[in-house]
A protein has these predicted regions:
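Formylglycine-dependent sulfatase
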Residues: 1-448, 453, 462-483, 511-520
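Short alpha-helical linear motifs
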Residues: 246, 337-343, 491-496, 503-507
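Residues forming the ATP-binding cleft of Hanks-type serine/threonine protein kinase domains
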Residues: 459
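A contiguous, mid-protein "functional segment" used to position or interact
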Residues: 472-501
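An exposure/low-complexity boundary signal
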Residues: 496-520
């Protein structure tokens, strides 16, 4: 059971230290499993981050570099790997994947065929596929209407798009509709009760999938749409939390005056300007925290369902997020850059097997990355791991309490910000808006194509306020981190059509075929 929340910051759970936002059900999962303290995504953007989770490959390896960029048809995903082992793989909720229509057309594959459905839904059975952003009633890249809307219509919520008009809108004092798209309404209750919300609906559908699959091996990706915007929570979650329970805003004037061109462009884009206002932050956080609390309560329902069905003792459960949320920290909104608020995520893995008894309830400080999950899943079901494709490492040795040799001592992330307003501010070409992060325990180094780097001393400046990208005293450190980044990029696995064993075995094919090269 692979559970993902959308845009959930690592530090907005009580088990990760939030003093006021209590998440007892997620905490209970951590007590039964391993809580990873240093988990990072391959890109702090929904689509590319998820594509890395699903493929076990870094962003510029799999090629889905932003939300609107399709995952190439040749990329294998969780569903493709596990299906070979006879495991039903389903998704309930969001994947943010776009079908590679050009690649499908080239191969003569249409979406109305079985293989067309598989390659359109990154290898998953789309049991309840819903990416959660529906200004109209049409599912993007599909002729289908939203099943959540059909369900709401049957419950009596009228109109062609109750997702927009009921579930993600509030009601004013005079009965007027207040749109959830407007951040000013984020602390008002949605027009539906909690039991009819997206989060409750997705939890129900997850339980239905598990019930249907109980007699055969299954893998379910339960991908909650929230706490991603619209930040519209049903009562009583909409105003559970007030300003004295929010984290203090995390920014200072040194950052505001930083004239690094890319960072400055991100601070100047319209989203960041909005979230940098205290009024906006204090309004939005009420809904954001309420949506997280609602997810935790629904996970309590789900875990009880698993307990009652006897599945809590035979189901591996992973809980994580696709990226964080700045919420005005560092003078930024949304995500996309590489501060901890954006690129770091919660990661909890519960393995019911006896081999995991040694690590139950532990907090693991080793670095892990999103790309490590797919090899972990394959390892857990004893399925072959495609080492020539997968760029992550199985976490099973860590879960078993072993001490794996040569474990990674840094993490890597990257962005293609060509779709962001910042590219236009900088007047960059579509292929020039790229940035790469390498982070170890002491330093965080960020390389920007065409611009000077950034460097942060995490030991002495854990808040990431003081940019040392131009410091003469740190030129040697910058060169060392750049070399580390180069090594990581060089180590990408791009020869995906041939295994290392094939290369080794076939290297003398010319002699075997009677071909003579360089013979006197």
């Amino acid at each position: 059971l692979f559970i993902m929340a959308d845009q959930l910051r690592w530090d907005y759970l009580s088990c990760y230290g939030h003093p006021h936002l209590k998440t007892p059900n997620i905490d209970s999962l951590a007590k039964r499993g391993v809580q990873f303290e240093s988990a990072f995504v391959q890109s702090p953007v929904c689509g590319p981050s998820r594509a890395s989770y699903y493929t076990g490959r870094t962003v510029f390896s799999h090629g889905s570099t932003w939300n609107q960029v399709p995952l190439p048809i040749g990329e294998l995903t969780i569903g493709d790997y596990l299906r070979q082992s006879g495991i039903r793989t389903g998704v309930v909720g969001k994947t943010h994947m776009r079908p590679d229509l050009e690649g499908m057309s080239r191969l003569g594959i249409t979406k109305d065929t079985e293989i067309g459905l598989i390659v359109s839904e990154p290898g998953f059975d789309p049991y309840e596929r819903d990416d959660g952003l529906h200004p109209n009633n049409q599912i993007k890249n599909s002729k289908k209407t939203l099943s959540y809307n059909e369900w709401l219509n049957k419950l009596g919520y009228d109109g062609p798009n109750p997702w927009n008009d009921w579930a993600n809108s509030a009601e004013g004092e005079n009965g007027e509709i207040l749109s959830g798209w407007r951040l000013r309404n984020s602390n008002k209750p949605a027009r539906i009760p909690e039991k009819h919300s997206e989060t409750a609906f997705m939890t129900n559908r997850a339980m239905e999938f598990i019930e249907e699959s109980k007699d055969k091996p299954w893998f379910l990706h339960l991908s909650y749409i929230k706490p991603h915007w619209p930040y519209m929570a049903p009562a009583p979650y909409h105003n559970m939390y007030s300003a004295n329970e929010f984290y203090p805003v995390h920014r200072n004037d040194t950052e505001r005056n930083n004239d690094h061109p890319v960072y400055k462009a991100f601070m100047e884009n319209s989203i960041s300007k909005t979230f940098s206002k205290d009024e906006v932050r204090n309004t939005v956080l009420s809904g954001y925290m309420g949506l997280i609390k609602q997810i935790d309560d629904n996970l309590g329902r789900l875990f009880k369902f698993l307990e009652d069905a006897g599945h809590m003792e035979d189901t591996m459960i992973v809980f994580t997020s696709d990226h964080g949320d700045y919420q005005g920290d560092h003078w930024l909104g949304e995500k996309e850059l590489f501060h901890e608020q954006s690129v770091r995520v919660p990661m909890i893995i519960y393995d019911p097997s006896e081999h995991a008894n040694k690590t139950r309830g532990t907090k693991e400080k080793r670095f892990i990355e999103a790309i490590d999950l797919l090899p972990t899943f394959l390892d857990a079901v004893e399925s072959p791991v495609s080492k020539h494709r997968l760029e992550g490492n199985s976490l099973m040795p860590v879960i078993k309490g072993e001490d794996p040799k040569n474990w990674k001592d840094f993490v890597f992330s990257e962005i293609d910000y060509s779709f962001n307003e910042a590219r236009k501010i900088l007047n960059l070409g579509a292929s020039d808006a790229r940035a790469f992060m390498i982070r170890n325990n002491e330093w965080k180094y960020i390389y920007y194509k065409g611009f000077e780097p950034q460097l942060f001393d995490l030991k002495n400046d854990p808040d990431e306020f003081n940019d040392l990208g131009r410091s003469k005293d740190h030129s040697k450190i910058r060169e060392e981190m750049k070399e580390l980044l180069l090594k990581r990029i060089i180590d990408r696995k791009n020869r995906v059509a041939a295994t290392d064993e094939f290369v080794t075995k076939e290297r003398d094919y010319t002699k075997d075929d009677g071909i003579m090269i360089g013979v006197w």
